[in-house]
Structures are given as C-alpha cells and as structure tokens.
C-alpha cells in the first residue's frame, strides 16, 4: 500500500544512497517489535529442490544484501529463501562511484558495483545473528586483485568458511564487473574450478556431517555452444543446481534511454526475455538432471510463471523488488 510513496522518495536519491538509506532503516527494525512494519504473511507453497525444503519458490537474488545485514527484515517480507553476497575472502570497496544507475523508463538497473563487500568473516558474523526461518544461500566470488588463474583459491577459502552456515552455496562466475571473471565459465577453466569445488564440498561434507548443495550462477550472454558446454560440465561434475541468469552486457533493448551507455551489467525488465530463453535452452539440455533457479527481470506473476514454465524450479527477484516493492513478493507467492 505505502510502497509507491516510499519509492517516490527513494527515487529522488542517487540509487546507491537510496539503497544505503533503506538498509539503515531495515537494520533499525530488524529484531525489534517494529519489524511488523515490513512483515507480511504469504501462503506456504512448499518446494523441494537440491535436497532442501523451501517454504515457497520465491527468493531474493544475490547483490541486494551483500553483507547479510538485513536477513531477518527481508525474510519477514515473505521470501522462501534469501541469497546474500556476493562475498569475497577479503573486504573490498568495489569500483568507483557512481556505479549504479536506474533506467526508469525500462524498469531496469545498470550496476558496476564490483563485489563491494566487507569480506566473508564479517558476513558470517551477521549470518550467526540472524533468525530467518527460510533457506539462506551464500553467494561467493573472488577478490578483484586475485589473478583469474588463482581465482579458484578464493572460492575454496569462502566455501570453507561459509559451509557450516549456508543452506546452499552459489558460485558467482558470471558478474561482468570483475575483470576476467566470466572466463571461468568456459572450457578447462570451468572444469578445473568445478572439480576443485566438488572436492572441497566432499571434504566439508565429511567434516561437518551435513551436505550443503552448490549452485553455479551463469551469464545470459552465452552462445548456444557455450550453454551446451556449461550444461555438460555441470552434469559431469555433479553440481547441485544452476542459477540462470546474472546481468547482461547487451544494451539493444534500452537504446536511447538515459544511462544506457553506462558500463556494467543490466538487470530488470530488459533482461526478462533473454534470461527466460537461457532457462528454456538449459532445461532442454539438462533434461531434469539438475534444477534451475530462474532469475532475470521477474516483475509480475506472469513473468514468474514464464520462468517456471521454461524450466525453473525456484525463482528470484531483485530489480523487480526495487521497482514494485514488497507487494510483489506476496503477489507472486499467492498466485504462482
């Protein structure tokens, strides 16, 4: 009810300042009686995926709560799962500002944040304090100053630390804002990374006596051949799930709009059709051998249904949440 007014005020601010302001308010509410201000009840629509039981199929995509500061307040809004991160072994400030832009007419966002986060140890402390009753995913990446050839070490460091606290772990090899990162999606580099991650998962499973599934997050900007190769690698290495998709470098759908020439990844409605097409193609290739978490431009019940019809078992929102507010969560979960 009140979100249009809140949005109008927030959209007067620079996007990153609006984000920081919102998170300051959410942190003040978290764990207090005032948390009811952001709480809403949504129907329970259980889904079993990656060996986990989700209370509903709608999650928050990584990138909004990078450091796990507002898990409880966001959880109170009705998400079945929340993915925090992307987090890296060491804290890093990310790219220079401004680095986040609203494409208001297209209901899209361009970001070149660059994995700004306070580091994996800080994230874990925040996760320990949270009481979220849903599934918590932790999205991990590599530090900007770690050479790509040594990138897998950063993923293994993060895995080692987050494993006891994660419902699932997401491997981000598809952000366009860390130089060279997307090269880890291809050929031998991907096989080498997935083999190391699977070995680490086996070791941690034995050490902690619990199995934490691993999902790999891929880009939308892949050729047919690359998509087929990735699907093959994921199956061969027994990866538990795939998150499709991250942001796009393609600007064809926002030509002529304000900020369309800004560098970074484009998300929101302009990504909707492309991400759904990647999910559909991936689903045909995987033949149910591992589940797909669908993300990219979901801003309505119809868009959510399209992702699931294309082959997604679970779905996530981010930009649609910014443009439509918490009401979108209730709407999707109720009518999906």
Swiss-Prot record:
Catalytic site positions: 175
Compartments annotated for it: namely:
Cell membrane
Q: Does the keyword Transmembrane apply?
A: no
Q: Name the major location.
A: membrane
Give the domain of life: Bacteria
Root EC class: oxidoreductase
Keywords linked to the UniProt accession = Cell membrane, Flavoprotein, FMN, Membrane, Oxidoreductase, Pyrimidine biosynthesis
Provide the cofactor note recorded for this chain's UniProt entry: Binds 1 FMN per subunit.
Q: Which InterPro entries would you find in this protein's record?
A: Aldolase_TIM, DHO_dehydrogenase, Dihydroorotate_DH_1_2, Dihydroorotate_DH_2, Dihydroorotate_DH_cat, Dihydroorotate_DH_CS
A Pfam family matched by this chain, by name?
A: DHO_dh
Please name the PROSITE patterns in this protein's record.
DHODEHASE_1 (PS00911), DHODEHASE_2 (PS00912)
Q: Where does substrate bind?
A: 66, 111-115, 172, 177, 246-247
Q: Name one GO molecular function term.
A: dihydroorotate dehydrogenase (quinone) activity
* Cofactor (UniProt): FMN
Q: List the EC numbers from the record.
A: 1.3.5.2
Under HAMAP family, the record lists: DHO_dh_type2
Kindly state the subunit structure of this protein: Monomer.
Q: What does this protein do?
A: Catalyzes the conversion of dihydroorotate to orotate with quinone as electron acceptor.
Full protein name: Dihydroorotate dehydrogenase (quinone)
Record organism: Yersinia enterocolitica serotype O:8 / biotype 1B (strain NCTC 13174 / 8081)
Lineage runs: Bacteria, Pseudomonadati, Pseudomonadota, Gammaproteobacteria, Enterobacterales
Could you tell me the gene encoding this protein? Answer: pyrD
């Amino acid at each position: 009810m009140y979100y249009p007014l809140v949005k109008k005020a927030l959209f007067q601010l620079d996007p990153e300042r609006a984000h920081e302001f919102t998170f300051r308010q959410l942190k003040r509410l978290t764990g207090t009686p005032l948390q009811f201000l952001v709480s809403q009840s949504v129907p329970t629509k259980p889904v079993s995926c990656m060996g986990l039981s989700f209370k509903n199929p709608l999650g928050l995509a990584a990138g909004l709560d990078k450091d796990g500061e507002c898990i409880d307040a966001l959880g109170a809004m009705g998400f079945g799962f929340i993915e925090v991160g992307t987090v890296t072994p060491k804290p890093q400030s990310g790219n220079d500002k401004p680095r986040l832009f609203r494409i208001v007419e297209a209901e899209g966002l361009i970001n070149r944040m660059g994995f700004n986060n306070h580091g994996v140890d800080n994230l874990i402390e925040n996760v320990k304090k949270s009481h979220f009753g849903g599934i918590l995913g932790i999205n991990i990446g590599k530090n900007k100053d770690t050479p790509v050839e040594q990138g897998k070490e950063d993923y293994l460091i993060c895995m080692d630390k987050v494993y006891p606290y994660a419902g699932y772990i997401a491997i981000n090899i598809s952000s366009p804002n860390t130089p060279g990162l997307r090269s880890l999606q291809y050929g031998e580099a991907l096989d080498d990374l997935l083999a190391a991650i699977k070995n680490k998962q086996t070791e941690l499973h034995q050490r902690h006596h619990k199995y934490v599934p691993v999902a790999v997050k891929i880009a939308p900007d892949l050729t047919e051949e690359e998509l087929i190769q990735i699907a093959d690698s994921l199956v061969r290495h027994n990866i538990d799930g795939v998150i499709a998709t991250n942001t796009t470098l393609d600007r064809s759908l926002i030509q002529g709009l304000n900020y369309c020439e800004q560098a970074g990844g484009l998300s929101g409605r302009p990504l909707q059709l492309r991400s759904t097409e990647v999910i559909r193609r991936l689903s045909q290739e995987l033949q149910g051998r591992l589940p797909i978490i669908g993300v990219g431009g979901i801003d309505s019940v119809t868009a959510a249904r399209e992702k699931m019809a294309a082959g997604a078992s679970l779905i996530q929102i981010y930009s649609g949440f910014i443009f439509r507010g918490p009401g979108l969560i209730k709407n999707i979960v109720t009518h999906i």
